[in-house]
Regions:
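C-terminal alpha-helix
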Residues: 107-114
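Alpha-helix capping/termination and helix-coil
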Residues: 11, 15, 28-31
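Conserved glycine-rich beta-strand-loop-beta hairpin in the small C-terminal domain of fold type I
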Residues: 1-10
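Conserved PLP cofactor-binding pocket of PLP-dependent enzymes
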Residues: 21-87
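Short beta-strand-to-loop capping motifs
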Residues: 9-13, 92-94
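Short, conserved charged micro-motifs
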Residues: 14-21, 96-103
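C-terminal helical cap and adjacent loop that interface with cofactors, partners, or active-site loops
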Residues: 79-101
Length: 115
């Protein structure tokens, strides 16, 4: 976030990210795969994919300038799918106790060994 409250791990591929995530979880550290994040990833926005809009002219999904309909598909942004599929995000509490930091550090070290 813009207040440095998240730490992101970018792994080499989705499979590696899943292994790393499982290892972190086993060490007591929760992460979220950004591609699976329902709110912050456009391809998970059901209202977006269904072209739901409050605009009576269906803008931005229709363009009154050329009468074309814009179509969006989950496969339209493969580079984003790749990058976000291998990105794990962990929340950081700015007042995190030293004990929690130690737990996170140990979990990261053990998870790195799995790779």
């Amino acid at each position: 976030g813009d207040t440095a409250t998240f730490l992101a791990f970018n792994l080499s591929d989705e499979g590696t990210a899943e292994k790393f995530q499982q290892a972190l979880s086993a060490g007591g550290v929760d992460t979220v795969c950004y591609k699976k994040n329902a709110w912050h990833y456009a391809m998970n926005w059901e209202h977006f994919l269904a072209q739901s809009t409050a605009n009576s002219k269906k803008f931005p999904f229709t363009n009154p300038m050329n009468n074309r309909t814009v179509q969006y598909n989950r496969r339209d942004i493969p580079q984003a799918d790749d990058l976000l599929g291998r990105t794990l995000v962990m929340g950081i509490n700015i007042r995190m106790p030293e004990e929690r930091l130690a737990t996170i550090r140990q979990a990261i070290e053990k998870a790195a060994d799995v790779l």
